[in-house]
């Protein structure tokens, strides 16, 4: 949640922030929020005065008898009714104020490139050589079916469209990828978690999981306040809710494994087929909690770890600095890694990492105490160590052979014990 003091002192900063994010200024009416805040403070002052009067009268009642006492009792009763009425108005104003503050996006980093949408994202780096095939490369779904690695047909029969079974060597690849991530990040001091796949809606809302458009929303559990998590960022982010951490313990570096569930409503088309957009997948998530002055460095650090993993897999990729108009609400700045996917003939997103500064920490009330005694909000960052479904696409398509077989990346062979997947059909 945004600090109301900043809005009071300079509301134009948020107005500009909303425009730069390509959001509707009318939906995020900053002037109205300022009015609500002023009204709340005015009501609070009035309530304080009335309560002071009532307390004074209550003290006087015991000092008087007869008519004077009855008169004071009546005055106290009238004040009580006024206070109750005013308190209700105050509660309504405060509720609307916090609701509107809750919807405001985070302040952009000055370093985030300005732009309207994904077309304005800035490529800042490329790594690896794109392989030239002497045959027409297949896409991952054709390869997966040829090698009996997925079953969408039975997944649809059992659960619904865009659900699937991973099979045979694809299962080994999932666990191998997780082991590669663990062996890469454990020496860096990360603590390992397997998180719940469900979270309370207050935690999901606190993280600010508000994807742009209808294509990635939360599954709700009927008759509960629970939702299936779309990322372990949600459960790792909520881990320290309402806590005050010690400065000397920061940064906290967490690696969380979970299933991820997304409704992906409206996500159709050639490039969304197969494993690219599915309702359920497994993911390892990097999550760091740090001091405000360290978050930019930690952001680059997470990106470096993500790059290290894909370099070990020897998959060509590029890094994008996401523009202001393509950022989600919590992120002040975000980097995406897009791997080369020969089957579609273009790069496709495989990881992202976001610096959410104090946005999530304010919403979840996570603070730290400096050695000097001051208490401040922490900064929180997240990144994809590996998203299995996207990683499998990149592996299948980059390591395919003319006969449809798939080579196993050298970095994964020790975990699997084989060097090649052969067609079974």
Curated annotation (Swiss-Prot):
SUPFAM superfamilies (UniProt xref): Class II aaRS and biotin synthetases, tRNA-binding arm
Involved pathway(s):
Aminoacyl-tRNA biosynthesis; selenocysteinyl-tRNA(Sec) biosynthesis; L-seryl-tRNA(Sec) from L-serine and tRNA(Sec): step 1/1
One Gene Ontology CC term in the entry = cytoplasm
Residues annotated to bind L-serine: 231-233, 285, 384
Catalysed reaction per UniProt?
tRNA(Ser) + L-serine + ATP = L-seryl-tRNA(Ser) + AMP + diphosphate + H(+); tRNA(Sec) + L-serine + ATP = L-seryl-tRNA(Sec) + AMP + diphosphate + H(+)
The subcellular localization recorded is:
Cytoplasm
* Similarity comment text for this entry: Belongs to the class-II aminoacyl-tRNA synthetase family. Type-1 seryl-tRNA synthetase subfamily.
This protein is called what? Serine--tRNA ligase
